[in-house]
Amino acid sequence: MVRNSVPSWFVVLLTVAMSIVCASGDEGLHVVTSTTDLASLVQKIGGNRVAVTSLSRGYQDPHFVPVNARSLLNLNRADLFLVIGLQMELAWLGEGLSELSPIAQCRNPRIQSGSLGYFDVSPYVQVVERPDEITRAQGIHPLGNSHYWLDPDNGRRMAQAITTKLSALRPNDAAYFEQQFALFSQRLANMERLWDKKIEPYHGYKVVTYHRAWGNFLKRFRLVSVGEIEPLPGIPPNDTHTSALIREMKRQKVRVILVEPCYEFKNPERIATDTGARVLVVPGSVGGVGKATDYFSLLEYDIESLVTVFQLLSGGHHR
């Protein structure tokens, strides 16, 4: 179900906007993404050959993003539209051929599902927590954990897929895109070595998260999730689940709770008070905090935040 609807007057506005766009001339490849993380990767690869717009902001819940007239104008203008997939955007973009979907309402044949300008990145990455059976028993993660970009290995895979897609749309710029990818990949490899060195003393440390967003990240950096504050992805906390989680945190001596900026803090703080744990606010997307300005600084911020709190809790002694 699509939660957003667009007023009928928008048709008039869109018609006017289309005429303006057509008269503006070629300004390079216009790319729209569902998330800021995709936008950052597109910018790294596309460089000055693309203009990139994200429909969401990094401090928003990427599962539930308001769609407005500006969103549809951006979609109408796009040569390429990228999505995270795995039903991440289902609640606000819909799927298939639904007439209520903003993708259908934007009246841009270039980016309709199945066209060259519609690109779901999820088939190109490693997805964790894939269920044996696809049901809503997995909450809003019915196809597995859709926050896969938080693993830098997947960041590289995403960038490679974006390189191939941009090259298909702009063959004359293919060499440029490949060069940009090589620079991105080398920089990411250098930073991964630094991140691995920083986090290595804390392999096996246990955390609780608000939302099941960190599966790929925790697996990549060898940390352990004991549970989530949400009973299922996207389902609000309840007393029964919270009480069980508190008991388990005490039993396993979990002292860190990861919370993204888009979530409420009342429940995490209550749990922290009852368990002696610390609430650590970590962005799950580019722009989630001011210092997370691109893909590299997002992961840098998250790693540094975790290392700092682990150091404090361990008294500087590694186990």
PLM feature segments, named:
Residues 1-10:
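Bacterial N-terminal signal peptides that target proteins for export
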Residues 9-19:
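Bacterial N-terminal signal peptides
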Residues 24-319:
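Extracytoplasmic metal-acquisition and chelation regions
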